[in-house]
Structures are given as structure tokens and as C-alpha cells.
């Protein structure tokens, strides 16, 4: 959410930013917000004037009563009753206006960074850099679920009978490989990157949902617990950032660098939907995430550090990757800048998304009231960032395809062998 003062002083910049994101249907919101904000401030001023007048009259009544002029005091008390009635109406109007302004402000997208390429959707994202040499073996690579089925590592039919499409049973060495990747990611982030490991709540309240994402994202992603003010998280970023809700942080304690493990639950109601037989887009998966809460001047430096952590992690497992700068139309409303990390698929002979890093500047912090007290005592909003270290279902696809041997076995990179009981290959 933007600063109202910024919108008030820079309406043209806000409108131009909306156009850059190809959301012209939101342009009327800016003028509506400005009009309602003006009316709100006028209402507040009128109410303040009435309160001041009420205070003045109250003193006058006290003075008259002290002088024994009860009749005169009673006459003036009628003015107090009229003021109280008018003040109640103004306060009700103020509440409605404030709610309306907030609702509209939450629909206006964050200001994107000047470096973000302009484009309508992910087809116009821009490649930044490649790491590792993509290899296509001279033998045919089966679909990832077929590789796992040959190794007795997955049962999609049983999962479909139990829960429907978008779920799976992982078994044996594949299940162990899944856990090994997560455990290695945890230790990589703790031991090599110095992040604090946290296991967060897997459900959050609606007030946190409103703070971490837009309503449109929430509708397409999150499962609500019936009869409760609780939602299953779509990523641990939600509960990790929510940890700082309604807090004032000490500047000397920044940055907070957390890495978290959690299961994730998603409706996947968007254009892509879920796969009938596959683990790329599913309803339930696990993930190792990282978040940073920092000073505004440090957020862009942390932004590159975060996505390079993911690049480094994948390269330790010998998986070629590339980074893509997300264009303006591909950015969610709260994001200022975002980079996707994609892994090489030898079967498809192309890269596919395995993680995303985002700098949300102060958009989430304003919604969640995450402030920082500086050394001079002044308070300002923190910047928040998030990044995927690894989501094993997608990582499994990249891992299996890039480490598959012609005989159907899977090589285990040295970094993972301690987490696989010393095994150097499976199958």
C-alpha cells in the first residue's frame, strides 16, 4: 500500500505506474481516493473544531455553575447536546470514509523500480544471466512422474482416490530424496548464509492475509478454514512477515534474516491450474523460504543477495539455472521488483521456474504496520523481501532430469550424499 501523502502529492506518477502495469481499469481509483481523502480530512477538521468548541463550552458551564448562574449554564448545555449529536454523525462518516479510502488504496499497485522492464506478461520477462552449461543427453528422458514410478517412488492414483488431483504419495528413495533436499536447504541457509531457522504457523488470520497479499491473489490461492478466521498458508513468507505485524523494531537490530520451512497449500485457480499427472503445479507441497526485514536503503542490496542464494544452492547440486527479470505486467501489485530463478529441463530443452525473489519495499510493512525506530527516535516503515530457496516438487523435476543416467538410475551429488545415508545413486 502506498503512502497517502505520496499519492496526494504525486497523482500523475501513481497513474503512470498503473499504466506501466497495464491496469488502466484502476486509473479511476486514484481520483476517487483523492476526493475521498480530501473529504475525510475536511470531516476530521470539522470534528476537531467541534471538539475544541465543546471543550470551551464545558469550561464556560463550569465557570457559570461556580458563580451560581445555573439557568445560564442550563441554556448553554443545550449547545453541548447539539454538538454531541453532530460529532457522532461526523465520527461515523469519518469511519466510513477511512474504510473506503483504505479499500481503494489497497488496490493501487506499489511503485515499480525504474529498472523493471515494461511488458504485459511473463512472455516479456528479460533474461539476466545463466549459470552452468545446459546438457541434453543422447538418450530419451521420460516425464518426471514416469521416472519416479520406475523407481517405485510415487503413487498418484492412490493420492487421487484419497484427495483428488493435485496431490501425491512419495515413497522410498524418492521420498527420502525429497526430505534430503529440504534438510540440505535448511543447513545451507543456516550454516553458509547465516540465516535464523524458523518453523512458523501454518495458518494465519485474515488481517495478516490482507497485509501480505492482494485480494485477487488471496482468492486464487488460499484455502479458508470453515467457521474460523484462519487461512492455510500458500507460502511461509506469509506467516514469517506476519510475525512482525504491529511492531516497532529497533534500527540497530536490523536486518532480520529468516529462513523457514513449511508445507504450503494452494488452490491454483489461475490460468495454469493443476496437473493431472505431475508434481509441478499441485495443491500441497513443502518449501524452504527466506525473508528479510531491513532498512529501506539496504533492500536492493539484499534483493540480489537473496536470489543469488538460490542460484548458488542449485549449482551445488549441479543443476544449470538462469535468472529472469520480471516485467511490469508480471509483477504482483505489492512488488516493486522481482527476479525468477529457472532450472534447466533436459527433457523439454528449456528452462522452467523453480523460485521467485521479490522486493516489496514498504508495501507490506504499511499494511501490517511494521515500523522501525531510528537512532534519532523517528519512526519509518521497514522494507520486506522474500525468496524461495527450494520447493522440492519442482526441484525434484530438475534434479531427476539432470541426474538421470541411461540405465534409469539417479546420481546423487556429493552435497546431498550425507542426507541420503551415503548413497551415491538410487535405482
Identify the role of each PLM range.
Residues 1-134, 149, 153:
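N-terminal alpha-helical targeting/anchoring segments
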Residues 27, 130-427:
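TRNA-recognition modules of translation machinery and tRNA-sensing kinases, especially anticodon-binding
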